[in-house]
Amino acid sequence: ATGAGVSNASGIETYWYQYDPEYQPKINQAMHNNPARLAESEILANKVQESLISETGAINRGVRRETFAVLRETAIPAILVELGFMDNPSELQVIKQDAYHTRLAKALAEGIINWYGAVEGK
């Protein structure tokens, strides 16, 4: 749901923050460039993306690094998931279905559980 107007973009994508010295922290000085937090965010992004694609069959738009403040200014592992494109009429019809919401919720929970198992198993 990142565009305006009508598009044919579709699928699911997940973002995590990788340190960029161009973006200095405004809130999160202590954990801004914490290697463990950043590594766990990358693992979380991959686990959630894998689970979402497996559960929904949506187009895999991948896992990407970004410098969004919502990711940068956290003290814990963080991701941003784009679950679809509301400006694509056919995708919007899928996004509006209650059954699809249930599958998304299940996949998000499963991805978080898989992430937890991966980071706790270190």
Language-model segments: residues:
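Active-site-proximal helix/loop segments of hydrolytic enzymes
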Residues: 1-122
